[in-house]
């Protein structure tokens, strides 16, 4: 029995590893725009506000709208195939961002990225919850979510290097596409790995659902009744996490630009420093949060997971506020580091 359990957990951790790579890829494709504020604004002649619509609204609105219907498909269908299709979609749309010739074509490409990525987490969390015992879920989901910090960090580190290189060579002639600026080539390059990860998912087995689950479709009316009966708890949770995520993603998108505009960093230097913060402290925060929540839950604290989120948000607050007051680069980096650790 113990051998069977160990073998099952081995395949479960393999599943988490592949899903973490998918999450990493999704955040590279999602966050790479944070280093391209200047080049994109210059190419299209747009303001910071219109850039924010491209980086934020175009992605997040349709990411949110498509989350529920795609989650419904994940509940009733093959989650592995759903993720494979959606990874392919967002990867192609990321590459197409590099071919956009104006604000609206880039907006539509970002919408495609958001729609594709909307399926990943609902399906991934469902697969992980079926593959692991409850006492190990906190650590397993934290490892999966490490893709957020790895992806964001790699987006800034590699993006900074590419943009720094592109600034020295100007435009690049690509057969079939004509002259491309560095930021366009960056989008096309980062869109490729997702297609490879989609193929890797073909080696993963669909975890068995709990006995009886999925045999009879649950009517949407019952799902809505379940939510309505718990509207206070779910409403507070959704609103609270949404506000927290709004702050977190604001920092993630504008963090490098904050370093460039406030302290005079070059894009390459800002990307390397902010990317390192994301990878090291973001990953540490994720592992710490998951480990602490698992330990508290094992000791009988049923509210361990939302409690960790609450405490982390409160600890993050002074670092976020400090970003608007500090005047030295090292203090700015310290505030970004603290905010990143506790937000993870």
Language model features: what each stretch is:
Residues 34-65:
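Extracellular/periplasmic helix-loop-helix junction of adjacent transmembrane segments
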Residues 109-148:
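Cytoplasmic helix-loop-helix junction between adjacent transmembrane helices
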Residues 2-9, 206-237, 262:
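Juxtamembrane intracellular "pre-TM" segments in multi-pass secondary transporters
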């Amino acid at each position: 029995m113990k051998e069977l359990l160990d073998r099952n957990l081995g395949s479960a951790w393999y599943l988490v590893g592949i899903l973490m790579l998918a999450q990493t890829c999704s955040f590279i494709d999602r966050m790479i725009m944070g280093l391209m504020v200047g080049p994109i604004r210059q190419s299209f002649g747009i303001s910071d506000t219109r850039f924010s619509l491209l980086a934020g609204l175009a992605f997040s609105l349709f990411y949110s709208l498509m989350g529920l219907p795609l989650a419904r498909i994940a509940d009733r269908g093959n989650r592995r195939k759903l993720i494979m299709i959606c990874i392919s979609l967002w990867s192609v749309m990321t590459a197409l961002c590099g071919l956009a010739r104006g604000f609206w074509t880039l907006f539509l490409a970002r919408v495609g990225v958001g729609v594709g990525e909307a399926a990943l987490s609902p399906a991934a969390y469902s697969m992980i919850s079926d593959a692991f015992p409850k006492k190990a879920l906190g650590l397993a989901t934290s490892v999966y979510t490490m893709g957020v910090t790895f992806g964001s960090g790699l987006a800034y580190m590699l993006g900074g290097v590419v943009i720094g290189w592109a600034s020295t060579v100007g435009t690049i002639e690509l057969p079939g596409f004509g002259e491309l600026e560095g930021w366009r080539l960056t989008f096309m390059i980062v869109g490729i790995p997702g297609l490879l990860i989609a193929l890797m998912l073909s080696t993963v087995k669909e975890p068995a659902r709990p006995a009886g689950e999925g045999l009879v479709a649950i009517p949407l009316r019952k799902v809505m009744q379940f939510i309505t009966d718990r509207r206070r708890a779910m409403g507070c949770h959704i609103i609270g996490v949404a506000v927290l995520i709004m702050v977190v993603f604001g920092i993630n998108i504008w963090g490098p630009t904050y370093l460039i505009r406030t302290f005079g960093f070059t894009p390459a230097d800002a990307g390397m420093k902010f990317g390192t913060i994301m990878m090291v402290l973001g990953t540490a925060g994720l592992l710490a949060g998951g480990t602490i929540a698992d330990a508290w839950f094992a000791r009988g604290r049923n509210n361990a997971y939302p409690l960790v989120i609450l405490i982390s948000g409160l600890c993050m607050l002074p670092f976020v506020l400090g970003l608007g007051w500090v005047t030295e680069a090292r203090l700015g980096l310290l505030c970004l580091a603290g905010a990143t650790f506790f937000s993870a």
